[in-house]
């Protein structure tokens, strides 16, 4: 009970200090207090000088020339789902976990809304909604200041609600690991001490995700459509280029990525190529909190070839020529850092957004909104 009381007292003092120092919402104040309250350095300062004193975690941001190499790398205000969007100093290891969620509903053909009743005039069944959950496990290691190695393995859970003629509803689902990605991030120009870097992303994905997912509905077993499969079934190259910029309080950047697919998988097809461009801006309110704004554009192609076990006449999701599209998302994020104490090196990040433009080779399900949250620990 004594330990619990100490923790609660420490958190209350932290919240009291933070409330006086900024104009954030009460929820954000207490989130920040929770992070600060478990750092021994802050606790010692609170005990010695009271809640009104300024802890190190509230110190104003310094010029780049006054920061250590490790602190400079920590200025990268980048969401976890910007793949390969940050690097590490030599010898540092990072473990990360990220949760991603996408909710889909309504249909588009091009930019035109299409109703389910209109789809059912051409197909015996139509999708009514879809959710994609992804749990991403990440590890990064930097053998040198210029080179960072990265590996990512997703675990997916996908559900798609369907309706048939006569108003009969059913749900398809698939779950399991997706394709493993391995990347090398190499600094081509600049350095973290200068505040500008150009980084080469050299990546490859391996077909560890299943392309043979099946469901049994109303006593009949059938192979699930292309969006319900967990992997690509092919070895894909994932090259890219990332620019990172940092100043006293600001961080910004841009990234271009591609997924280049070759050959065909064991089911006789390959997914379309993907092209992605994203840019972001972050502001360090303190050295433990930084909001961010990001815009992301993505183009993906239709399926080449076809799986003979997926009937393209049953629903639009099974048609290889109705898989491509273009979308622009606007996303806002929050980034929390632990600068001192036993949890030093920990980051907690959240980001949410929605499409501002969508053009689909449909009819296809439209994206309603996206959310991601994650935590990383570097040492």
Q: Residue ranges of each PLM-predicted region?
A:
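Short loop/turn motifs that connect adjacent beta-strands in outer-membrane beta-barrel proteins
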Residues: 83-92, 104-108, 129, 146, ...
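Outer-membrane beta-barrel biogenesis signature
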Residues: 43-120, 193-199, 208-213, 226
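Residues on the lipid-exposed face of transmembrane beta-strands in outer-membrane beta-barrel proteins
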Residues: 85, 97, 137-141, 151, ...
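Outer-membrane pore/translocation modules
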Residues: 154-266, 317-325, 357
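Transmembrane beta-strands of outer-membrane beta-barrel proteins
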Residues: 93-97, 149-151, 182, 196-202, ...
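Residues that define the transmembrane beta-barrel architecture of outer-membrane proteins
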Residues: 91, 131-135, 174-180, 196, ...
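Outer membrane beta-barrel transmembrane domains
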Residues: 108-119, 265-379
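Outer-membrane beta-barrel proteins
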Residues: 79-84, 143-145, 185-193, 198, ...
């Amino acid at each position: 009970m004594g330990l619990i009381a100490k923790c609660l007292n420490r958190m209350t003092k932290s919240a009291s200090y933070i409330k006086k120092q900024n104009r954030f919402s009460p929820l954000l104040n207490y989130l920040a207090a929770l992070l600060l309250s478990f750092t021994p350095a802050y606790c010692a300062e609170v005990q010695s000088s009271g809640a009104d004193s300024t802890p190190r975690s509230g110190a104003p941001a310094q010029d780049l020339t006054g920061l250590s190499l490790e602190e400079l790398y920590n200025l990268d205000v980048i969401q976890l789902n910007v793949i390969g969007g940050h690097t590490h100093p030599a010898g540092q290891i990072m473990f990360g976990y990220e949760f991603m969620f996408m909710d889909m509903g309504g249909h588009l053909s091009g930019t035109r809304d299409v109703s389910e009743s209109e789809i059912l005039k051409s197909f015996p069944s139509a999708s009514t909604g879809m959710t994609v959950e992804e749990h991403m496990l990440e590890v990064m290691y930097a053998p040198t200041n210029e080179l960072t190695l990265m590996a990512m393995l997703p675990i997916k859970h996908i559900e798609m609600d369907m309706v048939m003629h006569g108003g009969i509803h059913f749900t398809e689902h698939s779950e399991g690991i997706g394709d493993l990605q391995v990347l090398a991030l190499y600094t081509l120009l600049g350095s973290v001490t200068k505040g500008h870097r150009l980084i080469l992303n050299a990546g490859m994905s391996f077909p560890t995700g299943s392309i043979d997912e099946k469901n049994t509905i109303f006593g009949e077993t059938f192979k699930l459509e292309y969006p319900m499969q967990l992997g690509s079934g092919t070895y894909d190259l994932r090259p890219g280029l990332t620019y990172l910029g940092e100043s006293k309080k600001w961080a910004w950047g841009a990234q271009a990525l591609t997924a280049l697919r070759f050959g065909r998988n064991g089911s006789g097809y390959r997914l379309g190529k993907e092209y992605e461009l994203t840019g972001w801006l972050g502001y360090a309110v303190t050295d433990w909190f930084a909001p961010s704004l990001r815009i992301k554009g993505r183009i993906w192609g239709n399926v080449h070839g076809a799986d003979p076990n997926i009937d393209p006449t049953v629903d639009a999701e099974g048609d290889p020529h109705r898989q491509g599209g273009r979308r622009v998302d606007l996303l806002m994020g929050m980034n929390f850092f632990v600068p001192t104490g036993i949890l030093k090196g920990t980051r907690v990040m959240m980001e949410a957004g929605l499409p501002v433009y969508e053009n689909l080779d449909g009819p296809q399900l439209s994206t309603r909104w996206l959310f991601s949250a994650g935590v990383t620990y570097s040492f």
